[in-house]
């Protein structure tokens, strides 16, 4: 990225909340996105402890900047150091198991990060010639996802779900499976969510073994946080910081990465706040006029290249459940698959609570996943949809009033519903059930046998919380024997 040839320091001329105006000597104005540093005694005692990023040029000598931390304590006339480069974050194996903030500083009280390499957070998307054009699915080992809403390797997945339906557990299982089966790492970008949730996630990852506190090099995940209480500048940039960490593992270490962003809506929201602070005229519903551009710059960097892939799972908050709101609507345009978590499934104890009828995937196509996978997935969905249609009749008249065919459909649908549940490795300390990773061919075969009626004689509880179909058969034998 180009930088001003004459790197000279400036002075603060104005502070309005998180916006700081800095005046430079003539001919030394830093480029847009350049990181500047100020010593702010209002934050802590360290030198150069506040990073501000150039956002606009006002006149010939003044840069309008957005602060990445609190501006309390700044006064006019304070010296500002021009770093001559954009915000850069540490990358590589040394950041595994650590919690970083938007500028790459550790916030987990475990000492400095020993990384030798840093990368700027503002980077171009990979060239078209570097992209991997092969469309292939990303096996997660989770039956309901692999069968009905498969993830695209290097794709973007929207994760929808309210509070307490299992988003975090699903995420941790994905982190665990990617590490164990693919040797890949994961990066979690906490964008504008609650600090308590970030802290809980860190401790849950330690308990689940995803982060090894005693030997960080054995950890499988990096956490990059810009939480709700932080200024809009930090929340608008932290997703880029997390993505940069993931890009290094993809491009230099040739790994398959999983990037989790929670929550992509807060990225847009922070961008809207920054836009208003910079005095831009708002667009629809008060959002920034550059909404699609900002989203595109982030999403286009998340892709599959010849070296590796970044597959991204993004939690999406839908304001007032309005799917036409510009923020979620802009995110939808980039998604390859959606995983919808349904509270009704948690109420009947089906975990993961992924809705098999609401979740979708662009690659559930016979040309990509194969004819057998597609046919089995559609048969499963048809059976479940028929069961859903019959539920009103069952509630009013009871099962006895159904035709024989419908009774059979209901019995198979209930078995399918239970077979879509699965014990997770990261939850085994709570459930006592060892976690199961189910290979895709086993998943397809298991559901095909249920749909074809091969297991009509087995009790439905035999299919609950098992891995492959063989386990269900074994469980049925134990149930009948017991």
UniProtKB/Swiss-Prot annotation:
SUPFAM superfamilies, sorted: C-terminal domain of alpha and beta subunits of F1 ATP synthase, N-terminal domain of alpha and beta subunits of F1 ATP synthase, P-loop containing nucleoside triphosphate hydrolases
Name of a matching Pfam family: ATP-synt_ab
Location of the protein in the cell: Cell inner membrane
GO CC terms: plasma membrane; proton-transporting ATP synthase complex
Gene3D superfamilies: 2.40.10.170, Bovine Mitochondrial F1-atpase, Atp Synthase Beta Chain, Chain D, domain 3, P-loop containing nucleotide triphosphate hydrolases
Regions that span the bilayer: none
Catalytic activity as recorded in UniProt: ATP + H2O + 4 H(+)(in) = ADP + phosphate + 5 H(+)(out)
Annotated EC: 7.1.2.2
Keywords, alphabetical: ATP synthesis, ATP-binding, Cell inner membrane, Cell membrane, CF(1), Hydrogen ion transport, Ion transport, Membrane, Nucleotide-binding, Translocase, Transport
InterPro entries attached to this UniProt entry: AAA+_ATPase (IPR003593), ATP-synt_VA_C (IPR055190), ATP_synth_F1_bsu (IPR005722), ATPase_a/bsu_AS (IPR020003), ATPase_alpha/beta_chains (IPR050053), ATPase_F1/V1/A1_a/bsu_N (IPR004100), ATPase_F1/V1/A1_a/bsu_N_sf (IPR036121), ATPase_F1/V1/A1_a/bsu_nucl-bd (IPR000194)
Membrane topology category: Peripheral membrane protein
Domain of life: Bacteria
Ligand binding (ATP): 161-168
Major location (coarse): membrane
GO molecular function, one term: ATP hydrolysis activity
Family: Belongs to the ATPase alpha/beta chains family.
Assembly information from the UniProt record: F-type ATPases have 2 components, CF(1) - the catalytic core - and CF(0) - the membrane proton channel. CF(1) has five subunits: alpha(3), beta(3), gamma(1), delta(1), epsilon(1). CF(0) has three main subunits: a(1), b(2) and c(9-12). The alpha and beta chains form an alternating ring which encloses part of the gamma chain. CF(1) is attached to CF(0) by a central stalk formed by the gamma and epsilon chains, while a peripheral stalk is formed by the delta and b chains.
Function description: Produces ATP from ADP in the presence of a proton gradient across the membrane. The catalytic sites are hosted primarily by the beta subunits.
PANTHER family, per database record: ATP SYNTHASE, ATP SYNTHASE SUBUNIT BETA, MITOCHONDRIAL
Protein's recorded name: ATP synthase subunit beta
Organism name: Anaeromyxobacter dehalogenans (strain 2CP-C)
